[in-house]
């Protein structure tokens, strides 16, 4: 994930997405998450991170992969989310000193693999200051490492 993306996520307070995810569950365990980001037209190096998902996190995909909201000096609308089959989509819109518009689509094509696209645009005083698109692939690689 890019520095802007990390800053964006860290600057936001938690919002739990309201969505029924009874059909949408993935396997708990150790996941390898690879991300490639296009930031303001420039490709950044791919990143690979390990992520351990507990049984609770794996069972509540909407919460685990849902948006975060509540920027400083901006107000976020309640996130819009939708689950259709094995696809989770959400949209987060925040307005204020920094306007942020984030769209995400996660395709959980199996209980041990997913792909996602997260796109965000940041504007200050109406001027586009950040245009970020991140492609993500997650694959379960085994049990969580202690």
Question: What function would you assign to each model-found segment?
Answer:
Residues 5-16:
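Bacterial N-terminal signal peptides
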Residues 20-30:
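N-terminal helix-cap/turn-to-beta initiation motif at the start of protein domains
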Residues 33-36, 89-95, 117-122:
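Short beta-strand segments that buttress and anchor functional surface loops
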Residues 34-67, 71:
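Short, solvent-exposed loop/hinge segments that bridge or flank secondary-structure elements
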Residues 38-44, 95-100, 123-130:
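Short, cysteine-centered beta-strand-loop-beta hairpins and adjacent loop/turn segments enriched
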Residues 45-47, 98-104, 117-118, 130-134:
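Short, surface-exposed coil-to-beta transition loops
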Residues 64-105:
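Mid-chain, structured segments of secreted extracytoplasmic proteins
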Residues 122-146:
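Edge beta-strand at a domain terminus
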């Amino acid at each position: 994930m890019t520095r802007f993306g990390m800053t964006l996520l860290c600057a936001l307070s938690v919002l739990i997405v309201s969505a029924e995810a009874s059909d949408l569950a993935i396997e708990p365990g150790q996941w390898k998450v690879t991300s490639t980001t296009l930031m303001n037209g420039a490709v950044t190096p791919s990143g690979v991170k390990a992520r351990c998902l507990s049984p609770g996190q794996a069972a509540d995909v909407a919460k685990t992969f849902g948006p975060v909201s509540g920027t400083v000096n901006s107000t976020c609308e309640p996130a819009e989310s939708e689950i259709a089959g094995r696809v989770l989509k959400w949209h987060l819109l925040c307005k204020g000193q920094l306007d942020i518009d984030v769209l995400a689509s996660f395709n959980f094509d199996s209980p041990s693999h997913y792909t996602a696209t997260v796109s965000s645009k940041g504007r200050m005083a109406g001027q586009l200051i950040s245009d970020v698109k991140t492609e993500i692939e997650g694959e379960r690689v085994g049990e969580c490492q202690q």
